[in-house]
């Protein structure tokens, strides 16, 4: 029987997002969520952790693409990774995900990510795993940094690359990413499969199966966000009954 983790991204993004995540927790529709350090309702995310950490997992949602950074770097401003908008410095990492950056730029980015993590940990959160906003933990410049971050934070579990697809070149390339990370830190654990909730739901409904019977599958969702159709499916579906699986969290992986 497959094991499924349903992770709600963006905990802390806003009061609306947090309220929808809390509803999904209470209805047992998700088993995990990941916290952002620099968005509008960080305090609400910490409240959710304190109230629900006994039965779902809480990870670190590193953010390099939205909101204000927690550190200052003139180099990242000059590069454009940090950007000034209407007198406010904001994160702008998305255009750089496939670029090779200088050592000093990577160090400045690492400092920002570490500061985000420590802000959450200093509020009493014990991370179950690491993922990221807009998949930035999969950026080229993060490949040498992610194993180091895992070691420094004492976290061994990381979201996999989106790999729910037929076997072929594209899937092989995505599998290579995980192998490159493991080469640098053999203790890192990934779920076998990662895909968004709605795509998995629709494939399953059509009998399209790309996973093995004993795989651990992470399904990503965004309660309170723009994906209202996906959220409706999530909130009206008993995962274990629908997908013939066991619902687990990252602490059980």
Question: PLM features: residue spans?
Answer:
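Terminal accessory/targeting
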Residues: 2-5, 15-124, 129, 137-253
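DG-centered beta-turn motif at the end of beta-strands
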Residues: 8-12
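Active-site histidine-anchored catalytic micro-motif
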Residues: 132
């Amino acid at each position: 029987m497959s094991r499924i983790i349903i992770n709600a991204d963006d905990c802390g993004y806003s009061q609306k997002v947090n309220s929808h995540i809390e509803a999904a927790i209470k209805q047992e529709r998700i088993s995990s969520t990941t916290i952002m350090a620099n968005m509008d309702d960080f305090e609400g995310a910490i409240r959710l952790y304190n109230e629900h950490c006994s039965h779902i997992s809480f990870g670190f949602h590193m953010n390099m693409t939205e909101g204000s950074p927690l550190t200052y770097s003139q180099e990242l401003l000059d590069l454009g990774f940090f950007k000034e908008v209407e007198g406010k410095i904001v994160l702008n990492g998305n255009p750089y995900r496939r670029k090779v950056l200088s050592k000093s730029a990577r160090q400045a980015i690492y400092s920002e990510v570490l500061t985000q993590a420590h802000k959450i940990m200093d509020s009493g959160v014990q991370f179950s795993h690491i993922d990221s906003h807009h998949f930035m933990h999969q950026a080229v410049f993060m490949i040498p940094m992610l194993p180091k971050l895992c070691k420094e934070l004492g976290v061994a579990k990381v979201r996999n690359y989106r790999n729910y697809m037929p076997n072929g070149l594209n899937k092989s390339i995505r599998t290579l990413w995980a192998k490159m990370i493991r080469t640098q830190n053999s203790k890192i654990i990934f779920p076998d499969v990662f895909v968004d909730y709605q795509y998995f739901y629709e494939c399953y409904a059509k009998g399209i199966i790309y996973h093995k019977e004993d795989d651990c599958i992470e399904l990503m969702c965004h309660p309170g966000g723009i994906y209202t159709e996906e959220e409706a499916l999530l909130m009206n579906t008993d995962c274990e009954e629908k997908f013939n699986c066991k619902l687990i969290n990252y602490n059980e992986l």
